[in-house]
């Protein structure tokens, strides 16, 4: 079974909109992939979903977080030894989780992360690319 990690932006898109990210979230629910997350990702997700612009209740946000905890494996992360050339240093926690979980795919909509080509341990793909890969299996 494929081992994946979803970036926070994929969770946000899956929760708020229909489309490819929601299809990937369904893959997690249906246990067709093994998904990992970290406390840092969950914290970022909670902070983002709690922003007034999304108009979501705290109860809804907590239910979402509980569901994500139920369909993912929580991992502890280690700091990156070799700092990669990332423009947004706030993305480091995503890479730390990806390396710690020993995943096959990091799924993200973040252009900075998608532009990283130096990583040989796992592939960084968009939701669309991941679903295409999954179809070809």
Put a short name on every predicted segment.
Residues 19, 36, 59, 63, ...:
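Residues at secondary-structure transition points
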